[in-house]
Regions:
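Conserved alpha/beta-hydrolase "acid-adjacent" motif
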Residues: 69-75
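Hydrophobic "lid"/C-terminal helical patch
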Residues: 8, 41-44, 79, 106, ...
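Catalytic active-site module of serine/aspartate enzymes centered on a nucleophile-bearing elbow/loop
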Residues: 85-121
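Conserved alpha/beta-hydrolase catalytic His-Asp/Glu region
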Residues: 1-54
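Short beta-strand/loop motif that positions the catalytic acidic residue
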Residues: 56, 62-64, 68
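Active-site acidic short loop of glycosyltransferases
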Residues: 57-58, 85
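Solvent-exposed polar/charged
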Residues: 54-55, 80-82
Length: 121
């Protein structure tokens, strides 16, 4: 994992992310068993539910990051376009781990989405 850690982490965070945040996630990655990481990558690569997006009936919040090289914005747009009741929000100044890099904004957005669903119910 050490051999690929810097490349992977560079996809997870923007260059402006706090160093301690990046270093902590890099350490976590390096401690991950290589076979488990590879199996997870294979599973995600094989997972394709595009043909079922129209079946989603829940109000859906699709969150993307403008600088995400691991899951580019066009993937999020595809999901948002395919799910009938989807809304796409794009975080600037964030990469693949936008929920970590922009934790406060991410939590606020998700909390508002959930609150709105609860109020409607």
């Amino acid at each position: 994992m050490e051999a690929i850690a810097d490349l992977i982490v560079s996809r997870w965070f923007t260059p402006e992310a706090p160093r301690e945040l990046v270093d902590g996630h890099r350490a976590m990655l390096v401690s991950t068993p290589p076979d488990g990481y590879a199996a997870t990558c294979e599973a995600v690569a094989a997972w394709d539910f595009r043909d079922r997006l129209g079946d989603v009936r829940a109000e859906t919040l699709v969150i993307a990051a403008a600088e995400d090289r691991a899951a580019p914005l066009e993937y999020s747009k595809l999901i948002a376009d395919g799910v009938p009741s989807a809304r796409l929000v794009v975080f600037d100044r964030a990469a693949h781990l936008a929920n970590v890099e922009r934790a406060d904004a991410f939590s606020e957005l998700v909390s508002a989405h959930v609150r709105q669903r609860v109020e409607v119910a």
